[in-house]
Design a protein with these regions (language model features):
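Hydrophobic faces of well-ordered beta-strands that scaffold small-molecule active sites
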Residues: 51-55, 75-78, 104-109, 139-141, ...
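Generic structural signal for hydrophobic
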Residues: 67-68, 131, 171, 231, ...
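Acidic-and-aromatic substrate-binding clefts and catalytic sites of carbohydrate-active enzymes
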Residues: 54-62, 80-89, 113-122, 149, ...
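Active-site gating/metal-coordination segments in enzymes
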Residues: 38-43, 91-219, 266, 273
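C-terminal motif of bacterial Sec signal peptides marking the signal peptidase cleavage site
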Residues: 20-21
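H/E-rich (His + Asp/Glu) clusters that bind or coordinate divalent metals
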Residues: 216, 220-230, 235, 239-370
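An N-terminally biased module of ancient metal coordination in phosphate/nucleic-acid-related enzymes
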Residues: 24-103, 122-123
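Bacterial N-terminal signal peptides that target proteins for export
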Residues: 1-12
Length: 370
């Protein structure tokens, strides 16, 4: 009995230390005193060990991983409740993590089969438990919760629904990270010609079912964010990474409010760096200072990946070019352009210490076992 109690106390103490370390903002004086030697250059790209914590590798092919090796990246491949059956995604992930154990980790997910019945919770916990035993270091929760799932009465089911609490509690007790893609970028609720990013215009044109501007009956953008925030309030010790800048990509001030409120929350940058860049056009200093202040809560990621029918050479060139552009934005102060919008902007030239956190140490901190 004493041993169990001590273990619980130790676990509680460790959780407290983790949350305290997340809540503490960077010391601004330290950053201001950085010397020129403490900055990386564009030429350092391949020299620095890095993580891309959000990719989707759904083909038993090594070329995507080979490209990561050339770019000096380790990867986290994400299973998601969309497309291929989740069991097949896990099978591929296990093959590849065995082959490339020093280069690749994987995140599992769960499906919604039998939702609303007595079978759903036990089957979900059983699948997650098996995934953790096979090496999964995170659980992906996808936007179909909040955007597609309805109960038997036709009511929308959001992530703060009490029926998810048992699952979230199990994940927390297992010391596993939740990666949550909940909601969509705010552009999804705008007309296409009002969207700020070309990539969003293209995506929502190709996937009109997620273009919420066309579906006024669906939950609002604010509903999505509120449900996610409610879930975090109910689970203050759940280690949570909000995918895609936590669907708050449009305004660093709004994202800062959540990072202040929820010390157990970080965000990945997958497919949302152009949203930071477009904000840099109007207020470079605000974006720069935001990243400095929340340098312990930001994790680099791209959201690239491969499918069995992918043109691997094209995908590898695209992800390499994106990584090079992102690196230039973060480490230099050069004038830049990107395909997502026409305006020019300046790189952020972040100190080495900050770059190392975004690309390396934060991945290890928020995804233990990566």
């Amino acid at each position: 009995m004493k041993i169990c109690l001590n273990t619980k106390i130790a676990g509680w103490y460790a959780a407290c230390i983790f949350l305290q370390s997340c809540a503490a903002p960077a010391d601004k004086k330290t950053i201001e005193n950085i010397t020129p030697a403490a900055y990386y250059s564009a030429a350092d790209f391949t020299k620095v060990k890095k993580y891309d914590t959000h990719v989707h590798i759904n083909a038993d092919d090594s070329t995507f991983i080979d490209q990561a090796k050339k770019d000096n990246f380790r990867l986290l491949t994400i299973n998601v409740n969309s497309g291929h059956p989740i069991e097949e995604q896990r099978r591929i992930a296990l093959i590849l993590t065995k082959k490339f154990h020093d280069r690749l980790a994987f995140a599992t997910t769960f499906n919604l089969d039998n939702w609303g019945t007595e079978k759903w919770q036990p089957q979900t916990i059983a699948y997650l438990k098996e995934s953790f035993e096979k090496g999964a270091i995170a659980v992906k929760i996808w936007k179909n919760i909040g955007m597609e799932l309805k109960d038997a009465n036709g009511k929308w089911v959001m992530i703060d629904d009490a029926r998810f609490d048992t699952i979230l509690n199990f994940i927390e007790k297992s010391n596993i990270t939740v990666l949550g893609h909940l909601g969509e970028p705010r552009n999804a609720w705008l007309a296409t010609d009002s969207m700020t990013i070309a990539g969003d215009k293209r995506y929502f044109t190709e996937h009109p079912q997620y273009h919420q501007f066309l579906h006024k009956e669906n939950p609002s953008y604010e509903d999505q964010i509120r449900a996610r925030d409610n879930m975090l309030s109910k689970h203050p010790h759940l280690r949570f990474v909000g995918a895609h800048l936590g669907s708050l990509e449009w305004n660093v001030d709004e994202l800062a409010k959540r990072l202040d409120k929820f010390p157990n929350m970080a965000v990945d940058m997958a497919a949302r760096i152009p949203h930071l860049q477009v904000q840099s056009v109007k207020n470079w200093q605000k974006v720069h200072d935001f990243i400095i202040k929340y340098q312990d809560r930001l994790v680099y990621a791209t959201d690239h990946g491969v499918e069995p029918k992918s043109n691997f050479a094209e995908v590898n060139k695209e992800v390499h070019d994106v990584r090079i552009s992102d690196w230039k934005y973060f480490v230099t102060d050069e004038e830049m352009t990107v395909p997502d919008f026409s305006e020019k902007f300046k790189g952020l030239k972040l100190p080495k210490e900050v770059i190392d956190k975004i690309y390396l140490t934060n991945a290890k901190k928020w995804f233990p076992g990566i």
